């Protein structure tokens, strides 16, 4: 009975800040690696919501029916002590300014 609710995909947002120990020339590769990791775990594309100019701080949206704790645990393994991340479930889009790609992703999921 309740299992159909558990299988409904939910939308999530992850904010990731790579530590100062990551050399600037490796930031892009690390961000892409983390995006690919999340994409493989959730079995769908991950939408980059924003990236700081140096790519040390990024935000991404993803959708999954998987237990979010599985994704959290894998992301924890893939990051270092100096990295930081926050993941949360996303509700309805309340509005946006200048974030059309991210807003469009939210509106269509």
Mark where each language-model region is:
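Short S/T/G/P-rich N-terminal loop/turn motif that feeds into the first structured element of a domain
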Residues: 2-34
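Short beta-strand element of the conserved SAM-dependent methyltransferase core
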Residues: 14-16, 60-63, 87
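Short, surface-exposed beta-strand/loop "edge" segments at domain boundaries and coil↔beta transitions
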Residues: 21-25, 69, 94-97
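A hydrophobic alpha-helical transmembrane-helix feature that marks the membrane cores
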Residues: 25-27, 31-41, 51-52, 97
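Short, aromatic/basic amphipathic alpha-helical patches
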Residues: 33-34, 73-77, 101-105
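Short, intrinsically disordered low-complexity segments
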Residues: 39-82
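A short, structured active-site edge motif that brings together acidic residues
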Residues: 83-94
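Short, low-order "capping/linker" segments at domain edges
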Residues: 94-109
């Amino acid at each position: 009975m309740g299992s159909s609710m558990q299988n409904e995909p939910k939308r999530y947002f992850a904010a990731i800040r790579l530590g100062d120990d990551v050399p600037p020339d490796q930031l892009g590769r690390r961000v892409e690696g983390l995006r690919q990791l999340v994409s493989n775990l959730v079995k769908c594309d991950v939408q980059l919501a924003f990236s700081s100019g140096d790519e040390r701080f990024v935000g991404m949206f993803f959708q999954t029916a998987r237990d979010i704790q599985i994704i959290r645990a894998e992301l924890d393994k893939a990051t270092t002590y100096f990295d930081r991340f926050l993941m949360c479930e996303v509700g309805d889009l309340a509005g946006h300014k200048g974030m059309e790609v991210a807003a469009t992703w939210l509106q269509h999921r």
